[in-house]
Regions:
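Glycine/proline-rich low-complexity spacer/linker segments in large multi-domain proteins
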Residues: 223-244, 347-393
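Carbohydrate-binding surfaces of carbohydrate-active enzymes
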Residues: 1-280, 288-292, 330, 392-395, ...
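Aromatic-lined ligand-binding clefts that engage carbohydrates, nucleic acids, or primary amines
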Residues: 287-314, 341-345
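A beta-strand/beta-hairpin structural motif
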Residues: 322-326
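Beta-strand/loop-rich accessory regions of lumenal/periplasmic or secreted enzymes
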Residues: 263-269, 273, 304, 321, ...
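Short, hydrophobic/aromatic-enriched beta-strand segments in well-ordered soluble domains
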Residues: 216-222, 285, 341-347
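Short, surface-exposed tryptophan/glycine-enriched loops
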Residues: 288, 328-340, 344-349, 354, ...
């Protein structure tokens, strides 16, 4: 469980043993985002007043990105070179924006005047003044459908310059993203998925499809990549019945057979305590596989999963899936004929905590510090848990 101020990474979390998959993703993203320097168009001067916290939800013009500038850097480190504002580390900006300020030090006014005389574009005033200045710059990122100004959670991005390469970190919102995207860069592009490790060629201005909350890197001028395989064909396989097993001591039956997948909270015959199970349960089933076309890859798609799935096929570990899409390449593991699929699924502590809150304190198996701040309300409904599916197998071939 977590609270308003974060999530505790401790060994008592249900998902603790799966953390290497998540932290590996964090490590890869941080590694790539630390390379190079920011490549944004606008420097936003925060002003000279004390406590000048920027408005992170300010309706900044869509298609541009901003870095913040304080008085120390303005005075001691910022210079103008070839019409661009630069710092010793190598980052540069095209516009220095100074919003309407009620208070400004004489030294600040003097320094801004010096930078303007050196050829830098210094813009005073509100958003309208900034927009007029940016018309001569051109958008760094354009999308179809177009996004509104301000912090837009449908499609967010960061731009960094790594040597001769332009690297964009793109993040979709909770609804996902499917639309055309144009970056202000020429040349061949490659999309890199830090979760799966997949890397494929992409053409600037084409449609970019992202699952809910998915993030990818789009790189121009870096390593070349092969074209993505888009020909997707479902392979006829019957994934049923399922044998579902739970550990002892938490109110759930040790074994149950399911003809169809459903949330643990909706399994007929389960007690209230069983429906509220939190932890890891194991799914097992067998299916017959007839093969796919030569050269095609096989991808197993578990559909909806709540919340983490560790996949085994024919006794071999395939991969841990902790975010959408809950799918993995099983080309090296699947075989013609009978196959044995095992999936270990882990949910969060939430359902058990909700159940325990409605029990006498002596009967509870979970407890939380700072109960007032962290506990869900007594009447909170249980959230879905387990594999909800549908589970499918696909053959992925070249176009």
């Amino acid at each position: 469980m977590g609270g308003f101020n974060g999530t505790p990474f401790t060994r008592l979390q249900t998902w603790w043993r799966h953390m290497p998959e998540f932290t590996a993703w964090l490590t890869k993203c941080e590694e790539l985002l630390e390379e190079g320097v920011p490549s944004n168009d606008v420097l936003w001067y925060l002003g000279d007043a004390v406590g000048h916290k920027p408005d992170e939800y300010y309706a900044f013009p869509e298609g541009y990105a901003v870095d913040y500038l304080n008085h120390d850097v303005l005075t001691n480190r910022l210079t103008v070179k070839n019409g661009l504002f630069t710092i010793p580390e190598g980052a540069s900006w095209k516009v220095l924006w100074v919003p309407d300020e009620h208070f400004m030090l004489p030294a600040t006014r003097k320094r801004l005047a010096e930078l303007a005389k050196s050829g830098g574009k210094v813009v005073f005033g509100g958003k309208d003044a900034l927009v007029k200045a940016l018309l001569t710059v051109g958008k760094d990122v354009s999308t179809v459908p177009a996004l509104g100004d301000g912090l837009n959670e449908d499609f967010m991005w960061l731009h960094r310059k790594v040597g001769v390469m332009d690297r964009y970190f793109v993040v979709a919102g909770t609804s996902g993203w499917s639309g055309k995207v144009s970056f202000r860069v020429n040349g061949a592009a490659a999309v890199y998925d830090p979760v799966s490790g997949e890397r494929y060629a992409w053409r600037n201005g084409d449609v970019l499809e992202l699952h809910p909350s998915q993030s990818v890197f789009v790189e121009f001028g870096g390593e070349t990549a092969s074209k993505r395989r888009n020909q997707k064909r479902e392979v006829a396989c019957k994934f049923a019945p399922w044998r579902l097993s739970f550990p002892k001591g938490w109110g759930a039956p040790e074994n149950v057979t399911l003809d169809a997948l459903r949330s643990w909270t909706e399994i007929s015959g389960f007690t209230a305590e069983a429906k509220a199970y939190s932890g890891t349960a194991v799914y097992e089933t067998e299916f017959d596989f007839g093969g796919v076309a030569d050269g095609a890859r096989c991808v197993l798609d578990l559909g909806r999963v709540e919340s983490i799935a560790k996949v085994y096929l024919n006794g071999k570990e395939v991969r841990t899936l902790w975010c959408e899409p809950y799918s993995c390449d099983v080309t090296k593991f699947v075989k013609k004929g009978k196959n044995v699929l095992k999936v270990e699924v882990t949910n969060t502590w939430r359902n058990r905590v909700v159940y325990d809150l409605n029990q006498p304190e002596k009967d509870r198996k979970t407890w939380i510090l700072y109960q007032k701040n962290f506990n869900p309300p007594l009447d909170s409904p249980l959230i879905p848990a387990g594999i909800l599916g549908p589970v499918k197998l696909f053959g992925i071939g070249k176009e």
